[in-house]
């Protein structure tokens, strides 16, 4: 990596959150404007301390092949929604390609990987063998709390507009595994196996 300092943005999360929280109409120009301004804002806010922006993007997940219930409630919610989610995702994907082709940001989009996988891998890569490089994660996803075990990894939540902190990230990760994750459709360890 040429510049190990990085601001890693959870692209799909910021794009979808913008559409949903702003109650945006499905307008390509408006969604593009929102996504680009959001990225620009975080670049300006954190670049001095954390360097280059890296945009981590979702692809279809290998997890659904292993566990079909993974995020099934989200799919069901979208099906019941009046919003044209196919069009929203088409626009988000198109803007991702435009950013990759025309902007100075690094865009990482890996087949069968979610942004979570990319972010976790990048963080571990920057922390291995005593590198301990500063990393800022832009995401409201609490799954990233487990990465806070590295002292120089910070997380900023666009939803709450504040830093995400936890006094014991290792304990949080253990509890998260044991309790499951209802938002992702992952059962706790006591649930019957399918």
What is each model feature region?
Residues 2-3, 49-50, 76-194:
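Extended two-metal-dependent nuclease catalytic cores across DNA- and RNA-processing enzymes
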Residues 1-98:
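Domain-level signal for Mg2+-assisted phosphodiester chemistry and nucleotide/NA-binding surfaces
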């Amino acid at each position: 990596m040429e510049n190990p300092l990085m601001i890693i943005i959870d692209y799909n999360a910021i794009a979808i959150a913008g559409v949903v929280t702003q109650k945006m109409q499905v307008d390509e120009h408006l969604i593009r404007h929102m996504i680009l301004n959001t990225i620009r804002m975080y670049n300006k806010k954190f670049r001095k301390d954390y360097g280059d922006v890296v945009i981590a993007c979702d692809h279809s997940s290998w997890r659904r092949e292993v566990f079909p219930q993974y995020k099934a409630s989200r799919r069901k919610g979208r099906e019941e929604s009046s919003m044209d989610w196919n069009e929203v995702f088409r626009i988000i994907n198109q803007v991702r390609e435009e950013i990759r082709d025309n902007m100075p940001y690094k865009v990482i989009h890996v087949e069968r990987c979610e942004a979570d996988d990319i972010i976790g891998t990048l963080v571990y890569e920057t922390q291995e063998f005593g590198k301990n490089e500063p990393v800022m994660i832009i995401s409201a996803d609490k799954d990233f709390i487990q990465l806070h075990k590295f002292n120089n990894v910070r997380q900023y939540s666009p939803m709450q507009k504040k830093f995400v902190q936890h006094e014991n990230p290792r304990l949080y990760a253990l509890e998260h595994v044991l309790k499951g994750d209802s938002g992702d459709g992952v059962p706790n360890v006591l649930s019957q196996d399918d």
